């Protein structure tokens, strides 16, 4: 293995005897993305974290290829699965950036159970950072209502996603029944119900992109929150933007199943939704659909006085919901992340490690002060990762390109890379 990949869970003492962690699998150096997930699933000790690094590129994956049976147009079909399934806990998947590291699948059949670019199945404590997952149905950009999942979670707890982009049309992100997930600085793109499912899911500073839907109004979320949960979907300090045709047409959400909950807190709505805000679905009554300090594109309070409070139940009887469609300040404070996750604190786990100041010697060695919080250093040449080291220096190999810049990025415990350091030019003249 190269680029400092190592056996699963390997630890390397640095020059001061501190434990540093290596990446266990580097894509594509050590194999494909599908091979990396397979290696994580089949490692003997799943109690230790397994770190996958994905170098910047666009990867079109075919999935595991196992035969699965689906129902289409009333008929059963056996197809080759386009899904890649992670079943092991304690796995990190980290790229170089969500704008330049893309994992794309191309499912040929619609549906939640046969399209997931990445399916997290019982994969507790998964950490994903700095990449994009795209479910590109039939490679057909006109299929704006296709039901194709980019990320699917099932029976997972404690997942953290940082700088992750998810793109599809309908069902882009199918969330975690019975689970908990934290998203920070992520982007979710879609058309209909493109955030749907159960669990307690906290979207912190995320961007929600409304994709073009042939002039029809989009619906952002369709929660299926379990009845015993105090929290469902929490959108905090997010931004809604996208196709200009969605102005005044789209809906924030609709109640799919169970006891749906969704709140939008301090959300910038660059495109305003339909004045009703919420719509109906299948006779399900929401447990709570509400907002607090929604903002328009001029950062003024958005109009919310006409938000829907009446929904039809399964018997087609109109019910006036008893909750407030606009939260009081005291009610909104209950959705502080420390109240939603009082013992977990995922925002601390996703913290990035600040870079050091990098210098270069006449000999061609670059060096920096050691960063105690860093579990690994990524060496960048012209901003692309070319090597890793656990020591606070890097000797540029002989024969390397001339007149190029080098910088350093530090990895946190989970393997996510922080910002780049200052750049130095090789050779030093």
Descriptions of predicted regions:
Residues 1-12:
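Bacterial Sec-dependent N-terminal signal peptides
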Residues 12-381, 385-429:
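Sequence-level preference for short, compositionally simple segments enriched
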